[in-house]
Structures are given as C-alpha cells and as structure tokens.
Amino acid sequence: MFKRKSTAELAAQMAKLNGNKGFSSEDKGEWKLKLDNAGNGQAVIRF
C-alpha cells in the first residue's frame, strides 16, 4: 500500500504536476447556463 513519507515531498510533486493552473473555458459548447424570464436556471454540462 502507498505510504506518504513526507508532506513536503508530496507538495513538491504536486507543484511539478500542476502545470495547468485552472479550468479552460474556451469551449463554449461544453458548459452553458441559461436563465429564463422568470429567473429559473438551466445548465447543460457535457463530458
């Protein structure tokens, strides 16, 4: 089983892996949120 030896080592590994600092929302077809006139929300989420 995996055992963590050092939290500092884990943080260093995560810093190396986390090259992308956030979610890219360039693709508008992937996430859509709409409100109708009454204020009701509707979302389409595609994976």
Curated annotation (Swiss-Prot):
UniProt-listed GO biological process terms: DNA recombination; DNA repair; DNA replication
Any GO molecular function: DNA binding
Record's keyword annotation contains Flavoprotein: no
Transmembrane segments: none
Alphabetized UniProt keyword annotations: DNA damage, DNA recombination, DNA repair, DNA replication, DNA-binding, Metal-binding, Zinc, Zinc-finger
Domain of life of the organism encoding this protein: Viruses
Other information: Interacts with the polymerase and the uvsX and uvsY proteins.
Subunit record text: Homodimer in the absence of DNA, monomer when binding DNA.
Biological role stated in the UniProt entry: Binds preferentially to single-stranded DNA and therefore, destabilizes double-stranded DNA. It is involved in DNA replication, repair and recombination. Binds ss-DNA as the replication fork advances and stimulates the replisome processivity and accuracy.
Protein name per UniProt: Single-stranded DNA-binding protein
